[in-house]
């Protein structure tokens, strides 16, 4: 499996991340997971470099301070130079990585199938801290300021069905919310006050960032195995019922359902002010009106 670099890009979305043109410290572009890119691509993108790896790269790649970080199915976590693609360091773990890493304050945060979340030094890969959960972690983590603005928090989901908020410096648990089934998708942090994610129990959850208490719960028609996409107070997601759904986060009301053919939607959507864009198992990219579905 190879990692490719085409161009550098950044997000305009507000969050805990430093806004540098070549920085992409959280998968999906920012805390809200809108999937938007703040710069355009050239007409004919050039491949700058390629890195050969020993396993499949399942999770997204992130970038901070000219360092590219990614995990793979062989249990290798790798950091390479953004400009040249040369390896800076590599660490081997006992289990594989499906989750995307996130980077903040010179620290890499990544969940592993060994049931642990790791905080590692960006420049060396050395341990800072780790916590153990009750099942594998396939979802990426998110980064946000605490509601009082005095600290930074990690928000994470796991296959144990638990959404957790942790102190980014120490790993200390701030709160947790338990569901009945595994959670496979990265949680979105919206407007600095909501935590949003879908679960394998068919529900879309909106939690209060401050204490993890549920605010709204939208019932879908099948397991939600992917990450949601948000923009403003709007959220979209796909599921195994072969549908894409759109809802209002403030009211918790389902606004529309979209279906085309009998193929599930397992990819994370991108959302802007007009449309929802999502890839389906039918090998197509679907562009859906955000207003009407």
Give residue spans per PLM region.
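N-terminal, post-signal-peptide region of Sec/Tat-exported proteins
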Residues: 43-59
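Repeat-blade elements of multi-bladed beta-propeller folds
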Residues: 18-29, 54-77, 91-118, 131, ...
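Bacterial signal peptide processing site
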Residues: 10-12
């Amino acid at each position: 499996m190879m990692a490719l670099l085409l161009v550098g890009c950044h997000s305009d979305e507000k969050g805990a991340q430093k806004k540098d043109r070549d920085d992409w410290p959280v998968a999906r572009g920012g805390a809200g997971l809108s999937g938007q890119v703040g710069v355009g691509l050239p007409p004919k993108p050039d491949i700058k470099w390629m890195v050969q790896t020993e396993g499949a790269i399942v999770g997204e790649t992130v970038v901070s301070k000219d360092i590219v970080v990614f995990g793979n199915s062989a249990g290798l976590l790798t950091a390479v130079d953004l400009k040249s693609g040369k390896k800076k360091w590599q660490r081997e773990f006992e289990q594989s990585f499906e989750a995307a890493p996130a980077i903040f304050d010179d620290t890499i945060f990544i969940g592993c199938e060994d049931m642990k979340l790791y905080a590692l030094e960006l420049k060396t890969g050395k341990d800072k801290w780790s916590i153990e959960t009750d099942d594998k972690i396939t979802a990426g983590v998110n980064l946000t300021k605490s509601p009082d603005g005095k600290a930074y928090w990690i928000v994470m989901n796991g296959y144990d069905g638990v959404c957790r908020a942790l102190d980014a410096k120490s790993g200390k648990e701030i709160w947790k919310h338990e569901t009945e089934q595994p959670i496979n998708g990265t949680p979105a942090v919206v407007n600095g006050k909501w935590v949003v994610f879908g679960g394998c129990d068919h529900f879309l959850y909106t939690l209060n960032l401050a204490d993890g208490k549920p605010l709204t719960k939208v019932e879908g028609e099948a397991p939600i195995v992917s990450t949601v996409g948000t923009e403003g107070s709007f959220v979209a997601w796909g599921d195994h019922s072969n549908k894409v759904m759109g809802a209002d986060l403030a009211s918790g009301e389902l606004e529309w359902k979209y279906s085309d053919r009998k193929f599930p939607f397992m990819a994370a959507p991108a959302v802007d002010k007009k449309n929802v864009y999502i890839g389906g198992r039918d090998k197509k990219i679907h562009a859906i009106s955000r207003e009407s579905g």
